[in-house]
Amino acid sequence: MASGTLAPGCRISATEVPGSRPNCHLTSSYFSHRIIPPIPFTPPTVQSTVADPLPQVAKQDSHNWAFDEVLSRWETTSGSAYVPKTHGGPCAQPRAPEPADPTRTVGIKDLGEKLRHRGWRLPLTTKYQSSETRAQYTGSPSGDPRAPEYFGPQPPQLADHHRGGPSQALIAWTKNPELSGRPFTVSDRGVLDRRQLYLTTSARDFRFYPKTELSGYPRKDSLTYWSFEETPQVWSHGPQRPPCPRSSRPPRPPRVRVPRVSPVTSAMPHRGALSLAQESYSPLLHPLRRLDRFCPLEAPWGGPHWKPLRGIYSVPKAYSTENSSYGSLKPALV
């Protein structure tokens, strides 16, 4: 076999040079991902236009940009703003004028200049609009002297009291001779004692009782039921004197703890260890079973016989549908 013949099963790809012997051990990744030599950054075919003279349109323009002395199509607003600034000299950036009144400024514009260009107006909303009814009926009291006055008990005025008005005929409760020498409490024995609408039940019942009212009741420090029993005494429920020390008390007998007897409950009758679902829903019964557990009725008369024969049923055509005989030209019993 000559050296130039190809091995069976090997094909020449588009990337291989014709006439050369292919390598059958190469994979498809080798043919797909070929190694391409890198190209230099500055391609040899690129020609620089920096040294070329400017076009006639650019020469007539009075404003020349610093981007190769040519108007750039790719320059943006941010690119022209974020550049090195010059703070002095003929190429300095223009300065914003200072406002006349620094306290009344909005942004970088003077408020007076802003109002001169556009006057102050209310916003176009229904909040500031007034209807005819709202303009006539404002709800405020009118100063018309012809309006009728209210004739009734007027509130007392201090000027009328000093002129000898009817308020001088009132007797102060501190100078009432009928109640002089008696203990008097406004909230207890006042004139409005029975008509105090805002007096609570606790303030009316649990009040301060004088000694004259408590003379017919036994005192709290007398011998009571708690003195005989070994019950912890609460303050104001027993003798006001502190009890004797614990060391001088007789020893208490040991307490006999009676065990608590739990009530005996009878066992609940059940049908076995079955849950409610298992007891309620039993498995399917045999179709030939006569008596049912939940429905003790016999099978319907249209069901199969106990010894069903071939093609014999208790009801004619009980198990055949209309579609099975439709269009068959067979006589049907009605």
Swiss-Prot record:
Biased composition range(s): Pro residues: 240-251
InterPro entries named among the record's database cross-references: Axonemal_MT_stabilizer
Superkingdom: Eukaryota
Chain intervals with Polar residues compositional bias: 128-141
Start and end residues of each stretch annotated as Disordered: 81-105, 128-153, 233-260
PANTHER family in the record: HCG1796489
Official protein name in the record: Stabilizer of axonemal microtubules 3
Species this protein is from: Homo sapiens
